[in-house]
A protein has these predicted regions:
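Residue-level recognition of specific faces of alpha-helices
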Residues: 7-10, 64, 87, 207
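Histidine-centered, transition-metal-coordinating active-site segments
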Residues: 35-196, 200
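Single conserved hydrophobic/aromatic residue that forms the stacking wall/gate
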Residues: 1-3, 197-209
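An N-terminal structural lobe/cap that precedes and organizes the functional/catalytic core
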Residues: 4-51
Length: 209
């Protein structure tokens, strides 16, 4: 694997919150300037790591981390690989989680989607990965075929309707949001309670600024 691919993949979610996207939405609600985990990931590697000195990463890696989840497209092929890999990975992980939680069965996925993508996680990952490789060969960008891209988008839409908005999942998400918002409110007025005693002064200032 290319070193840049690996660096972007390892760094792209360093700024994520507890409870994933639910925690991200909670912080975005309460932070005066909003909160996006991809921007926080950049802050981690540029400011917070190495006692406030950052990791001295290349601009290509920083760009890939920042744009793996935003309106902008990564400037490099490596960044585009990670961005697309992230989409492929999390929708399949979410299916696994939903099955384990008893929210759905894989057999309930629409037949037309299973026909294109496959009937199991292994088949879906194989289809999606192979499609990206074949359709990106000798091209200046990383992409999928129209058929598979649309099937992936429809799968994500199905997950939003039947899983993410499911009353059970929604109830757990609401609890997570309240927890993060309550913690933020508490520490905002009790900064002395933050465990910063073993953190260097540059890092401490970066954390509270």
């Amino acid at each position: 694997m290319c070193i840049r691919d690996r660096a972007i993949a390892l760094g792209h979610d360093l700024g994520h919150t507890p409870f994933g996207h639910a925690g991200e939405r909670a912080l975005n609600n309460v932070c005066p300037c909003g909160f996006k985990h991809n921007e926080q990931s950049v802050r981690v590697v540029e400011v917070l790591e190495k006692q406030g000195e950052g990791l001295n990463l290349t601009w290509e890696v920083i760009d890939g981390i920042r744009n793996h989840k935003s309106a902008g497209m990564p400037a490099t092929l490596e960044g585009q690989i990670v961005r697309l890999s992230d989409k492929i990975a999390y929708v399949n992980h979410d299916i696994d989680d939903a099955v384990r939680a008893g929210i759905m069965n894989e057999e309930e996925l629409p037949k037309e989607l299973r026909k294109v993508l496959g009937n199991s996680k292994r088949e879906r990952l194989n289809t999606l990965t192979h499609d990206v490789i074949v359709n990106s060969m000798d091209k200046p960008k990383i992409c999928m075929s129209e058929e598979v891209r649309e099937a992936l988008m429809e799968l994500r839409a199905y997950m939003f309707t039947h899983v993410y908005e499911n009353p059970l999942a929604k109830g757990e998400e609401d609890k997570a949001i309240r927890m993060v918002e309550d913690l933020y409110s508490y520490y905002e007025t009790h900064m002395e309670k933050l465990s910063l005693i073993h953190i260097s002064e540059p890092t401490r200032l970066a954390l509270i600024s």
